[in-house]
Amino acid sequence: MAKSKNHTTHNQSRKWHRNGIKKPRSQRYESLKGVDPKFLRNMRFAKKHNKKGLKKMQANNAKAMSARAEAVKALVKPKEIKPKMPTGGSRKLSRLAYIAHPKLGKRARARIAKGLRLCRPKSQAKASTKAKPPAAAAPAAKGAQAPTKAPE
């Protein structure tokens, strides 16, 4: 008995990709950002059937939006703009307070000290290492090679 052709998978992917990858619905119509969803739904049908209806709907909607904006403008009183004080210095002060704190600043102080050690000039670093007397050499392990002096 022949297999039924109802459940075909032939050329399905081509059919799926024929329309391309679509944008999300919210991003599809860039010119209609502030439009109500009912209008967008109607627009789908209008696009299929008649472009004239679509233009009319768009014009009416634009009129309604502008009228609404004007009404809102009339109702809402403009507020007085208060001058803002710059807040640049407070961060520096709070950082210093954090470092000076006996418990919280412990790690911060250690990190700063480490940075200072690493950034110290080479001549100063050498002077600090030479000041320490060299430790006595530990007895060599059995079978270990004796250290050789590098020629100077």
UniProtKB/Swiss-Prot annotation:
GO terms for cellular component: cytosolic large ribosomal subunit. The keyword Transit peptide does not apply. Component of the large ribosomal subunit. This is Large ribosomal subunit protein eL29. The modification N6-methyllysine is found at K5. Transmembrane segments: none annotated. The modification N6-acetyllysine is found at K33. Residues 1-32, 119-152 are annotated as: Disordered. Pfam families: Ribosomal_L29e. Belongs to the eukaryotic ribosomal protein eL29 family. The lineage of its organism: Eukaryota, Metazoa, Chordata, Craniata, Vertebrata. The modification Phosphoserine is found at S31. It is found in: Cytoplasm. Coiled coil: none annotated. The keyword Ribosomal protein applies. Residues 1-26 have a biased composition (Basic residues). Residues 121-152 have a biased composition (Low complexity). One of its GO terms (biological process) is cytoplasmic translation. It comes from the Eukaryota.
